[in-house]
C-alpha cells in the first residue's frame, strides 16, 4: 500500500492539484479553508445546509475515467490512472473506521456496488471528487446567480444563504441536481438556520462575524 500511496501522491501533486476549480469549492484546495467557506455566508439571514451521503464512495471508476479523459489523456492512460485511484469493496480499509455501526452502515450501503470507487484517505480522492463535482457546482452557481443566493461546497457539505428566505433554492431542486450527478442527500443533515439561531457553517459561527463558537473556545 505504501507504493500505491506514493504513486497516488504523485498523481495528486502533478495532475490533480493543477486543475483550476471554481471559487465556491472550499475544501482540498490550496489557500482555501473552513474560514473562507464560512465567510461566504457571514451575516446572512437564512442559511440552508445539506450533506451528501457517502460522498467519496458514490464516485465510481467510470466517473474517474471520464474525468481523466476530459483532462486530455487517451483511453489507455485514463483507464490506468482511474484504476490506480479507486478500489473495490473487498479492498476497502475498514480499519479506518472505529465505530462498528458506522462500518456496518457503510458496508450495507456499498455491498451492491460492484465497480471500484474513490476511497477515503487516498491522496487522490479529494481532488478527484472536486473535479468530478465541477458540473454540479457550476449548476448550483448558475442557480445562485439567477435567484440571488450564495452557494459554497466544503467536501460533502453544501451551504446556501440569502437575506430573503424565498431566494433560497428548494430542497427538491437541490436534490434533483445532486441525484442527476450521481449523489444522494443525507436527509438527517438538512438544516435551515435563520437570524437568531446559532448559525454555524463548517464549525464556525457566521451570524455577525465569523468566529469560533464559545463551547469550542472552552475546550481549547
Feature-to-residue mapping (PLM):
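A residue-level signal for conserved active-site and pocket-lining positions in enzyme catalytic cores
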Residues: 11, 125, 203
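Polyanion/phosphate-binding surface patch
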Residues: 1
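Flexible glycine/acidic-rich beta-alpha junction loops that bind and position SAM and/or redox cofactors
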Residues: 193-201
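Active-site-proximal segment of RNA-dependent polymerases
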Residues: 4-56
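Active-site and adjacent loop segments of nucleotide-processing enzymes
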Residues: 200-220
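Alpha-helix initiation and N-capping motif
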Residues: 4, 8, 21, 31, ...
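Conserved polymerase palm-domain catalytic core
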Residues: 42-154, 159-194, 215
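Short alpha-helical "patches" and their helix-cap loops
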Residues: 21-35, 143-150, 155, 216-220
Amino acid at each position: 500500500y505504501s507504493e500505491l500511496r506514493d504513486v497516488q501522491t504523485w498523481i495528486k501533486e502533478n495532475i490533480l492539484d493543477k486543475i483550476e476549480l471554481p471559487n465556491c469549492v472550499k475544501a482540498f484546495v490550496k489557500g482555501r479553508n473552513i474560514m473562507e467557506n464560512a465567510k461566504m455566508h457571514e451575516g446572512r439571514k437564512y442559511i440552508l445546509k445539506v450533506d451528501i451521503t457517502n460522498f467519496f464512495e458514490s464516485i465510481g471508476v467510470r466517473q474517474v475515467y471520464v474525468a481523466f479523459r476530459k483532462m486530455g489523456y487517451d483511453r489507455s492512460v485514463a483507464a490506468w490512472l482511474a484504476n490506480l485511484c479507486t478500489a473495490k469493496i473487498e479492498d476497502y480499509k475498514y480499519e479506518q473506521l472505529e465505530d462498528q455501526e458506522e462500518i456496518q452502515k457503510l458496508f450495507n450501503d456499498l455491498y451492491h456496488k460492484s465497480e471500484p470507487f474513490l476511497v477515503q484517505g487516498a491522496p487522490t480522492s479529494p481532488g478527484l471528487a472536486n473535479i468530478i463535482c465541477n458540473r454540479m457546482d457550476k449548476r448550483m452557481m448558475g442557480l445562485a446567480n439567477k435567484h440571488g443566493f450564495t452557494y459554497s461546497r466544503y467536501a460533502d457539505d453544501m451551504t446556501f444563504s440569502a437575506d430573503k428566505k424565498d431566494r433560497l433554492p428548494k430542497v427538491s431542486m437541490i436534490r434533483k441536481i445532486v441525484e442527476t450527478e450521481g449523489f444522494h442527500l443525507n436527509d438527517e443533515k438538512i438544516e435551515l438556520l435563520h437570524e437568531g439561531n446559532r448559525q454555524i457553517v463548517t464549525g464556525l459561527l457566521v451570524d455577525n462575524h465569523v468566529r469560533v463558537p464559545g463551547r469550542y473556545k472552552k475546550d481549547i
